[in-house]
Amino acid sequence: ISINQDLKAITDMLLTEQIQARRRCLAALRQRLLDLDSDVSLFNGDLLPNGRCS
């Protein structure tokens, strides 16, 4: 049972790290788009202020 709990904890940590890395990547891409053309509003009504999709 302990091994299964350890594996689950490791999997959860890896998934959390992967999600955080993807969010950082998306934030960087969003900023690059804003920097490329600051005259165009990239606001999308489906996005919440924290960058998550509704």
Swiss-Prot record:
Disulfide bonds join C25-C53. Pfam families: ELH. InterPro entries: ELH (IPR003424). Keywords: Amidation, Disulfide bond, Hormone, Neuropeptide, Secreted. It is found in: Secreted. GO terms for cellular component: extracellular region. GO terms for biological process: neuropeptide signaling pathway. One of its GO terms (molecular function) is hormone activity. The modification Leucine amide is found at L36. This protein consists of a large 36-residue subunit, bound by a single disulfide-bond to a small 18-residue subunit. Injected in sexually mature animals califin C excites LB and LC cells of the abdominal ganglion and cause egg-laying. Belongs to the molluscan ELH family. This is Califin-C. It comes from Aplysia californica. The lineage of its organism: Eukaryota, Metazoa, Spiralia, Lophotrochozoa, Mollusca.
